[in-house]
Amino acid sequence: KTLGGKGNVIVHGGTPGNPMTASQAVGWREVFAKHSGIKVLEGPVDTNWNPALAQKVTAAAIAKYPKIDGIMAETTGPIRAFLAAGRPIPAWAGQDLNQLSCLWQDHHAANPTFKMATASAHTWLARLALRKGLAAVNGINNDEPSLINLPFSEDSTSSDKALRVKCDKSLPATAIPSAMVSKEDMRMILK
């Protein structure tokens, strides 16, 4: 929506062959196929979900491509690459992370193209999977869904207050806003 059906995009992935990057690629390829003006310059690029590697990969892309309109990434390394290069931060799609939200809060005013939408990092899915697994092993019915559609967690372009960007400087950078854990527990876990 933010790109208006046209623009140059770079997509980062995680580890080579991981199912999350593969399933996301199915989705974005389907969407981008409907918008011939969107060009994927690179991706999914394996970054091992490592912010330093993602920054390095993005720095190389910045040197190679004069115009990058969007990034899909799960780390904040690409933001640091744009800041270091003195280039405007482009539109961003990824997973919710406190550090990402705080970087948006700190830099969006000076970077009007830095619009951000995140989906839940879905750390809470382990809890759901464990309950379903235990129910299956013990012959107990579990009606929780097996397929989950991840809605937006944050959308800087939305007027919906529930989707506002959720920077909390009292929490560690690695805190995940959608984790369904109290702030106190998150501080303890991420010490």
Model-identified regions with their sequence ranges:
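Short beta-strand elements at the ligand-binding edges of bilobed clamshell
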Residues: 1, 11-13, 109-123
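Short beta-strand elements in bilobed, periplasmic/extracellular small-molecule ligand-binding domains
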Residues: 8-11, 32-51
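Hinge/cleft segment of the Venus flytrap/periplasmic-binding protein
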Residues: 12, 16, 121, 130-191
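Extracytoplasmic "Venus flytrap"
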Residues: 13-23, 76
